[in-house]
């Protein structure tokens, strides 16, 4: 599968979000997602915060689903993230890892590898889980 055949995401209780083939709705988003992922890596490499770019990436990723509820839930997550993120001890390497994992999401989707996409999405959340664990232990 490639960007030409694109992705939508279904819900599976055992796998979380899972990619499934659909129309070519992501073709028009590939360049934007790639640019956002690159910008996140650049910001993280400079030790700068990329939360707004991260937010834009996730909203752009979900747009082709055509599901307003998913977009609203994604936006709600980012409102919570904006409140919680400053209270977490985020290490500079966490930011870079997160940014690189956004790039991995784009690369896996572009390559048409559903397993790599599932893995990239799951791996993407590891740094935030680590930050939350640090905050809870403090």
From Swiss-Prot:
Xref: SUPFAM superfamilies: GntR ligand-binding domain-like
Residues annotated as signal peptide: none
Q: Which Pfam families match?
A: FCD
Which stretches of sequence are listed as region Disordered?
1-25
* Record-linked Gene3D superfamilies: GntR ligand-binding domain-like (1.20.120.530)
Renumbered to this chain, the Polar residues biased-composition regions fall at: 9-25
ATP-binding keyword on record: no
Concerning InterPro entries, the annotation shows: GntR_C (IPR011711), TF_FadR/GntR_C (IPR008920)
Q: Which GO terms describe its molecular function?
A: DNA binding
For this UniProt record, give its keywords in alphabetical order, as a comma-separated list. Answer: DNA-binding, Transcription, Transcription regulation
Instruction: Describe its function.
Output: May serve as a transcriptional regulator.
Q: What is this protein called?
A: Putative transcriptional regulatory protein NedR
Q: Which organism is it from?
A: Micromonospora viridifaciens
Give the gene that encodes this protein. Answer: nedR
């Amino acid at each position: 599968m490639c960007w030409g055949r694109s992705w939508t995401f279904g819900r599976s209780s055992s796998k979380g979000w899972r990619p499934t083939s659909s129309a070519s709705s992501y073709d028009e988003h590939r360049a934007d997602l790639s640019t956002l992922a690159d910008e996140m890596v650049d910001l993280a490499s400079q030790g700068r915060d990329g939360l707004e770019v991260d937010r834009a990436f996730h909203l752009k990723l979900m747009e082709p689903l055509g599901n307003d509820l998913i977009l609203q839930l994604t936006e709600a997550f980012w409102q919570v993230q904006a409140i919680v993120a400053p209270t977490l001890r985020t290490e500079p390497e966490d930011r870079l890892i997160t940014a690189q994992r956004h790039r991995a999401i784009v690369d896996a989707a572009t390559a048409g590898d559903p397993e790599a996409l599932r893995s990239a999405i799951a791996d993407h959340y590891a740094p935030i889980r680590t930050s939350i664990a640090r905050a809870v232990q403090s």
